[in-house]
Each structure stands twice: as structure tokens, then as C-alpha cells.
Amino acid sequence: QVTIGEESYPLPKPFLVMATQNPVEQEGTYPLPEAQMDRFLLKVNLGYPTKSDELNIMRKQMSGTLEELSAVVSLEQIVRARGFIERIYMDEKIENYILDIVFATREPQNYQLGPLRNKISFGASPRGSIALAKAAKCHAFLRHRGFVTPDDVRAVAPAVLRHRIGLTYEAEAEELSTENIVTEILNTLMVP
């Protein structure tokens, strides 16, 4: 639901939001607060299109005729898929692996990652653990498996955590990225 003032409005189910983010360096853009960023399940970096893709984009835009879009999946199919994903099995060892990854963003010194302590200004919140578990289940679902593996967790960790970790000035001066931090955590922690 959405609440405006004292009035609440129910939202349809499923309710999905996809958003784009412009670089902060562009005029008129401002960074979202961490609490708002934390509400997004994933942050996927797309980069620029290839030259041929951009040529197609340019031609379609200039011709004034955009392709008719049709739904590739129905709302009912999304709801049904969500039900399947919720039932995907996650072993307690995988749950603890997820918690170790997230806790390593908060307390790196407790995970043989002491040097990261001066690089991370804040780590992932409990929403990060929940998001990592959900995304790992989705990854398993897309691979037609009824259970989560450590590889599922590792595959989605950068997209789930990159916007949930704050870098210190020291890390920024060294041109470290949150991807570097996540990679170091994944490469250091014991995989179950």
C-alpha cells in the first residue's frame, strides 16, 4: 500500500518497480539516501549499448515508428513463478553463507578481511540478507533447480550488494568500487 498523509491506497499484486539511475555527475541528479537505495532488490549496471545496437536505437527513434510491444509474461505467470521461487529449498549452510557475506560487509575484521575495515563506511542492512536469499532462489529457479547452491549466491551477490555498501574516502581515493569489496569478500569466505 501507499500512504499519502493519513490516507492509504492498496496497490495491485504483483506491484513491481523498475527504475533507472543517472550518474550523479549529471546536472540535476542527486544521490538517493541509503535507506531508499536499500529498498531496491538489485542494482544492475548495463553500461552502454554496442555500436550496432545504438545504430538501431538511433534509427528507430529517428523514424518515429517504435515497435509494438507485447507482453512476454502475464501477471498470473509472475504470481505463479513467485510461488515456485518461495518453495525453492535453501539449506541452513547456504543461509549461514549469506549471513557471513552480509556480516562481512559490516564487520570485515571478523572474517579475515581486516584491511576492508577502513574501506567500508557502512555495510549491508538486514534487507541485504533477505535480498540475497531471494535473488539466489530466483537464480536457482532460472536454472530449473529446486534448491540453492553457493554458486547461485555468488552469482547474484554483486547486483544485490553493490548499492548497499558505503565506501570511505580512503576507498574512493584508491578508486575501489563496491564490486571490488564484494569480490574480495566472496574470494575470502569459506564456501559451504
Where do the language-model regions lie?
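Canonical AAA+ ATPase core
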Residues: 1-88, 137-139
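Solvent-exposed alpha-helical segments within well-ordered globular domains of core cellular machineries
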Residues: 16-18, 34-38, 42, 52-60, ...
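Generic structural motif
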Residues: 49-51, 93, 172
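Conserved AAA+ ATPase small/helical "lid" subdomain
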Residues: 68-110, 114-129
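C-terminal engagement/docking regions of AAA+ P-loop ATPases
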Residues: 107-192
